Amino acid sequence: MNWVEFSSDAFIAAFFLYCFGFMFYVIAVAGKKWSNRDPERHVKRWARIAYIVSALGLLAHLTFFFTRWIGSGQIPTSNMYEFMTFLGMAIMIAFIIVNAIYRKPVLGMFSLPLVVLIVAYASVFPQEVQPLVPALNSIWLKIHVTTAALGEAFFAVAFASGLMYLLRVVDFKGTSKKARRAQRWVEFTLYVIVVIIAFIATVFVFRGMGYQASFTQELVNIDSRGVETTTVQEVDYGMPPIFKPYNSEVVEMESFLGLSKPLFETPSWMEGVNAGRKLNTIVWSILVGSLLYGLLRLV
């Protein structure tokens, strides 16, 4: 086993420790109302357990970071996978610092899910070590990316604190215009969070199923001199195609819940690399997220 493979194991360990830390914070906050319990003693005990488990998760995450650095020979912030893993680690560092100051278990109940979400989102991206472009092989990459992520991490903890505050002070039973406006914005924020969770879950589910669809897309480009060039490329989908690429034909498509062919074609004005696949991913995320949010509202 080389350093990069070992770092992947440490990353998985960090993810599960963060999940357990979150569950223990929930027990610390919600469990104080259980019968035959001293609420203050219960909160203190489980908050300490949650903090220790979360700190162990951070230790495993730091192990991932430095062992991947050793194995790759470069600081692991050079692609989206590495940056998002570093951002998750930075958020955890920020939480550890803020929690050491204020010692509020409810902050852990809101911050840990954010860390889990970022870490899970990182796993969506390719995990191979990629060599740095020579222009980026500079000390400024280490300084700029890491300090930017650390700054964003404290904003992330502030977001968790702000959301916690809003859920506490907004009057969800109020009928005034001001109360209804506050309710709508809080619900919109929660809806966006659920859609992001749905995106990550959908990617993992279809990836686990091994789903794949392929299209051949014909692209026509006219340069400044009026010369027309046509290129044909293959586009692969990891989710059932609700929207197929513009001006494309199906090469291979597995049926899913009766969906044996794309329902729509991506509009021609949507340009960019893999525009159709990105639109399809957004639509799936909104559909699944809306379903999850509707179920949560029913509960």
Region spans (language model):
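Polytopic transmembrane helical bundles with strong interfacial aromatic enrichment
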Residues: 1-299
